[in-house]
């Protein structure tokens, strides 16, 4: 049996908000395969968000979210990736992940559910395949590495 070190959650967007969470485990294949598959299942209507996190030290309940996590919202063809990571001052901040390239065209709004949506720039839109690389790096390191840039997420009136 695998030691559970991470949890995961899927958010279902249509109708009343529903979520399913539990341990992040690999039944067959690799963790890279698992993360890619979960992100490929996002359709922007029924499955609208996916997140993973490392369990806090000593925690065994996979639904307990630690200080850091990574999440994606949207569809397999166009999704945003956000990560709550530790900063140099020792506190966790939420960031939108983007590529190091100029913004082209107008912003895109990603629908999450009947109560939430997020607007991102063109360099902050990813496919499931692109996002899976970011997710795997986060799974292994609890961080988002180069060549990506992080823009602090504006919580606005939240």
What residue spans do the PLM features occupy?
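Acidic, proline/glycine-rich low-complexity IDRs
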Residues: 1-49, 84-158
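Amphipathic, interaction-prone secondary-structure segments
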Residues: 43-90
